[in-house]
């Protein structure tokens, strides 16, 4: 399903074993450009796509950002050939801030080259403000070398911003709001990349383990952490 310049409201639906063979777009759903995608009480299972195993969201330059709200849904065993095992979202030089919202969702067993569950990527200096609240992440795997089954990392998120000509990160372009997300393993990482070095989550993050998950680089800070 491709949503472009229109609105799609998906409720109480199952998306099973869909595949997108294009170079972009999610295995089940692709929201493109000035559009609205609202997903509630849906299940995305064993879908496969190039960017976003289940859902891919692509902003386009000089247009309003897509409006995305995903709630109370399950993403299980989806595979992305590239970024975002379950969901991939990217912004461009849009005329407004891209602010997708994902709440009360479960991500389990998804696989992508960058971000086993989610990849959020700002391809321009335009600010991106994703919100993630009350989500569960378990056994989502990131494998940059998709042809090598021995190289897997448990990485839930991959968030990266635009870099300059010298491959240095520009000022913060991805500003996530993360609260009360539950990680089954402490190694369910937030990041696999340090393109935005100064990201401050300033959120309540709960880990179902005895130690904080690792960080590969950058100067991330967390507040109000709880381990159970």
Q: What are the functions of these language-model segments?
A:
Residues 1-51, 63:
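Right-handed parallel beta-helix
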